[in-house]
Amino acid sequence: MGVTKKPDLNDPVLRAKLAKGMGHNYYGEPAWPNDLLYIFPVVILGTIACNVGLAVLEPSMIGEPPDPFATPLEILPEWYFFPVFQILRTVPNKLLGVLLMVSVPAGLLTVPFLENVNKFQNPFRRPVATTVFLIGTAVALWLGIGATLPIDKSLTLGLF
């Protein structure tokens, strides 16, 4: 790969081109009409065709039909509520469980302010926010997987 030199902004020819609007925004194909009239409809119709084809060729049931006369031993919430359900299930004091549930969105609201001085977008240059995100993701996965297990195996995930 060759070494490219930076453009000289004092060059009058370059300044004239930039003044005409021939800078970095002035290359390539325009989005209208090429993308919006030709490519997008093909992608949308292809996606619809794939979904319809899969629905016709491989119809799958949503789940087993419910039996109103037999309730399960433990009723589980939707999958996106598994971590907070696990918090409520394992904490002995219900008030503490509710406070822990409230602390989840409160903690998420504080993440942008942890490194608000740091203007980098690269996650490797934002170590505090990246660490908080990775630990939060690991805890959410641990709680979510634990919510699907019986209560005696939920904290250790059945590994110990």
UniProtKB/Swiss-Prot annotation:
GO terms for molecular function: electron transporter, transferring electrons within cytochrome b6/f complex of photosystem II activity; electron transporter, transferring electrons within the cyclic electron transport pathway of photosynthesis activity; oxidoreductase activity. Its main location: plastid. The 4 large subunits of the cytochrome b6-f complex are cytochrome b6, subunit IV (17 kDa polypeptide, petD), cytochrome f and the Rieske protein, while the 4 small subunits are petG, petL, petM and petN. The complex functions as a dimer. The chain crosses the membrane at residues 36-56, 95-115, 131-151. Belongs to the cytochrome b family. PetD subfamily. It comes from Solanum tuberosum (Potato). This is Cytochrome b6-f complex subunit 4. CDD domains: cytochrome_b_C. GO terms for cellular component: chloroplast thylakoid membrane. InterPro entries: Cyt_b/b6_C, Cyt_b/b6_C_sf, Cyt_b6/f_cplx_suIV, Cytochrome_b_C_euk/bac. It is a multi-pass membrane protein. It holds the Pfam family Cytochrom_B_C. Keywords: Chloroplast, Electron transport, Membrane, Photosynthesis, Plastid, Thylakoid, Transmembrane, Transmembrane helix, Transport. It is found in: Plastid, Chloroplast thylakoid membrane. One of its GO terms (biological process) is photosynthetic electron transport chain. Component of the cytochrome b6-f complex, which mediates electron transfer between photosystem II (PSII) and photosystem I (PSI), cyclic electron flow around PSI, and state transitions.
